[in-house]
C-alpha cells in the first residue's frame, strides 16, 4: 500500500480538509434522499467466510452481506471495492448498468470506512478473486473519520490502545488476539467445570482490602458514608465459601491494584482464583500444569508454544524446585546454612542488592530470588516453599515452619500462577495479620489489613484446602505471543491525552 494516506496524519491542514469533505458528502447524500444513519436493521444471509470457504456451493447464488468499505477502485462505469465484516474481507463489483445511474452516483460518493449492505451474485473475477456482483446496496452508516492505512504511519504509539475500535478495523491480527482470548477463557471454564468446580461471583467493593499484598483503589459509599476498596484479590470471600461447604469454587473477574504500569502490569486486570477442599499445593501443581496444557491444546492445537522467539513446552510434568534450592542453583548461595537475619542481609549486600532496615531472613531470600533467579526460569517451573514472612495466607510446612506450602509457577522468567496449601489455623492467621498490621503502621501500604470476619470464618472451621491464582492476561500473552499486557486487554488503562 502507498504511504499517501499515512502522510495525511502528519499534515493537520490536509486532514482537516478531508474531514470537512466527508461532512460535506453527508449533506450531499441527504440532499439525494439518502439518510446515512436511517436504517435500523439489515438482514444478512451470510458472512464473508461462508462464501470464501465454500465457493463451489455459493457460485451463481444471490447473497446479502454487510461490511465496512476498506478499499475502493473505480474504472469508469464499473467499480470494485473490498468490504470487511466480522470474519474478513470480500470483493464486491458495482456496475453502472446493473445498479442504475442514481445508485452508481451514490456509490461513487461513498468513502473508505463507510458501512454498506450489498445483495448480489457470487462469481470469480478475471483474476480469480471471489466477488459479489452487486445488484443492490444500501448505506448503513457514513464514516466521518479517516481510517489510517497502517498503524506504523502514525506518530502516536499509544493511539492503537486509545482507539482500539480503529485498531480492530485496520489490523486483523489484533482481532485474532481477542478472538483467541475469548477461546482461552472458555477453555479455562470448560476445564474447571469438567473437574466439578462451581463458578461463583463475589463482591467487587470491599470494606477491607485483603487477599494480596497490593495498594488498593479507594472509593466512597455515599449511602453508608464509608470508604470502600475495589478488590485487589478474590481470595478471602472464596475461602469463606469453602468454609460454607461448597468445596470446589472458582471465580474469574477483574481486580484492581493502584500500582505501577509496565508491559506485565495493568491496574485493572483479570484474575482466576480457585479453591478446592481436601487437597494441598501439590494438588494445585497438578491442576495448574494440566490447565495450561489443556488450554494450549484447545486453543493452539499443541502444548508447545513459541513466545518472543523462544519455544516453551507446557507438557506436564513441569520442573519443581524449592526457592532456596533455586537460589543455590543460580546464585551459588545456600540459605539453609544461614541462621541469622543479619547474616542474610549481609549476603544481599554482597550481591549488590538494596536492602531495607530490619529485613528478616525470609524477606532477603525472596529479594535474592526476585532479583537474581526469576529471569532464568524460562521453561515452566514450580518454585516451592516460600518464606513465611511473604506468605501471610499460606500454611506453614510442618517440617520447617520458617517456610510455607506455597508455590509460584514461572514461564519465560515471569510469574504466571501462585498457590498455597491454605492456612486454616485461625490463631496462626490472626498472628500473621497482626504482624502485617505492624508493617502497615510502619508505612507499608501493601501489607494486609486485619479481617476479623475472615478469622471468624476460620474459627467456624475450614477443611484442608488448596488454592490457586492465575493472571488470565498473562496466560493470554503467552498463548498469543503478545509482548505487552496492553496487547491482550481491549481497553488498557491510559493517561488522558490532554494531561
UniProtKB/Swiss-Prot annotation:
Sorted UniProt keywords: Aminoacyl-tRNA synthetase, ATP-binding, Cytoplasm, Ligase, Magnesium, Metal-binding, Nucleotide-binding, Protein biosynthesis
Positions annotated to bind Mg(2+) 1: 408, 415
SUPFAM superfamilies: Class II aaRS and biotin synthetases (SSF55681), Nucleic acid-binding proteins (SSF50249)
Enzyme superclass (EC): ligase
Subunit annotation: Homodimer.
GO biological process, one term: lysyl-tRNA aminoacylation
Molecular function, one GO term: magnesium ion binding
Family membership: Belongs to the class-II aminoacyl-tRNA synthetase family.
Cofactor, free-text remark: Binds 3 Mg(2+) ions per subunit.
Name of this protein: Lysine--tRNA ligase
Cofactor(s), by name: Mg(2+)
Species this chain originates from: Thermoanaerobacter sp. (strain X514)
Enzyme Commission no: 6.1.1.6
Gene Ontology CC annotations of this record: cytosol
Compartments in which it is found: Cytoplasm
Cross-referenced Gene3D superfamilies: Bira Bifunctional Protein, Domain 2, Nucleic acid-binding proteins
Catalytic reactions on record: tRNA(Lys) + L-lysine + ATP = L-lysyl-tRNA(Lys) + AMP + diphosphate
Pfam families per UniProt: tRNA-synt_2, tRNA_anti-codon
